[in-house]
Amino acid sequence: MVRVRFAPSPTGFLHVGGARTALFNFLFARKEKGKFILRIEDTDLERSEREYEEKLMESLRWLGLLWDEGPDVGGDHGPYRQSERVEIYREHAERLVKEGKAYYVYAYPEEIEEMREKLLSEGKAPHYSQEMFEKFDTPERRREYEEKGLRPAVFFKMPRKDYVLNDVVKGEVVFKTGAIGDFVIMRSNGLPTYNFACVVDDMLMEITHVIRGDDHLSNTLRQLALYEAFEKAPPVFAHVSTILGPDGKKLSKRHGATSVEAFRDMGYLPEALVNYLALLGWSHPEGKELLTLEELISSFSLDRLSPNPAIFDPQKLKWMNGYYLRNMPIEKLAELAKPFFEKAGIKIIDEEYFKKVLEITKERVEVLSEFPEESRFFFEDPAPVEIPEEMKEVFSQLKEELQNVRWTMEEITPVFKKVLKQHGVKPKEFYMTLRRVLTGREEGPELVNIIPLLGKEIFLRRIERSLGG
């Protein structure tokens, strides 16, 4: 059975790059009728926070990427937080030491750093070996460690050989002998390093495919060596391309919003974000761009992942969001849009009126947060607009003639035409002025939609105010 995992660190909000990784894993698991596992990599105790773990889960749920096993739902391969698995890592490290594939190091971190700096100053790569650390392994040092309650670090003996990775996306990647030296797998604080914890977890959780960003490609050499040491076949690796900003540089905060939470707060829809992220580094066999989650699952395959960097285009995401927003049932749209109106200080009293406003304005809106300003004039009188002198009589007469008219465009339009003809006013100039009087804006939805919905009382009141009444 296919088993994949998404393994974020709870050190901040879910970045769109992480969300895309989670999405690709989720789609592959669902397509192959496999399992999608959520694992929390929280061994960086200083930066990891349970609050961020909750936020990460909240963002994944909002996107609709639900996991089969994880810290909150459990499963047969737990615990699913690395901080709760420390004893497991220790046992596996000790096993490697017993088998002569790893060794204890009694050097203090600052001594290791000194060695590193010395190697660099001599123009050598900072590669470590067991011989370099032997001088620190003395009875005195061991006693010191014991008295201080410290554990020796554990270093892995890196075999001197080439390693070949057949990556689903990158193709054949060869790691040459001597690319790295021995490396730490358990620190003296008793916690595992990223690569070691990752391999132990993937082995024990029976992960079959590792789909992740290509910034992890450099970690793969260490991981392949560890799988070999444990005499386990590595999973299938698929390193997906980096997401770049419009300027071709790695996507970061300087490009604007980059977290799922920020996009949600701006009024983006999960359907749109999922659809857009899926197309960053993957393409539909028929080139389709607008795809539901179900369509993404049925058409997803790893062989359509591109090795080329993907460009994050905020305008395309916005366009796509507009499409989903306009095609949403009006009840759901009203439910999602309402908090944005409340935040803008607009109180919704009449639900049916609110839905009609959304129907009229949605063609001009691409994200939920744009609705309040686009439709504020339906709920509040705009500032009075001065009517040009040559049109004041037109508006005065209209105000009188429309008092007793039934409030439909079929009844209103003939009155407009009659009054304009009497005064010899060009329709274009009149309608532009009328729009400003009613909405306080130069552009917006069609007046034929605005006028009936505003109602006679508001229509006449706004003309009265602009005439100085």
From Swiss-Prot:
Catalytic reaction list: tRNA(Glu) + L-glutamate + ATP = L-glutamyl-tRNA(Glu) + AMP + diphosphate
The protein's name in its UniProt record: Glutamate--tRNA ligase 1
Extent of the signal sequence: none
GO cellular component: cytosol
Compartments, record wording: Cytoplasm
Motif 'HIGH' region location, chain numbering: 8-18
Motif ('KMSKS' region): 250-254
The organism's place on the tree of life at top rank: Bacteria
Family indicated by similarity: Belongs to the class-I aminoacyl-tRNA synthetase family. Glutamate--tRNA ligase type 1 subfamily.
A Pfam family per the record: Anticodon_2
GO terms under biological process: glutamyl-tRNA aminoacylation
Subunit composition and interactions: Monomer.
Molecular-function GO terms, alphabetical: ATP binding; glutamate-tRNA ligase activity; tRNA binding; zinc ion binding
Taxonomic placement: Bacteria, Thermotogati, Thermotogota, Thermotogae, Thermotogales
Known role: Catalyzes the attachment of glutamate to tRNA(Glu) in a two-step reaction: glutamate is first activated by ATP to form Glu-AMP and then transferred to the acceptor end of tRNA(Glu).
Gene: gltX1
Alphabetically ordered keywords of this record: Aminoacyl-tRNA synthetase, ATP-binding, Cytoplasm, Ligase, Nucleotide-binding, Protein biosynthesis
Top-level enzyme category: ligase
Positions contributing to ATP binding: 253
E.C. number(s) listed in UniProt: 6.1.1.17
NCBIfam families associated with the record: gltX_bact
Main localization, broad class: cytoplasm
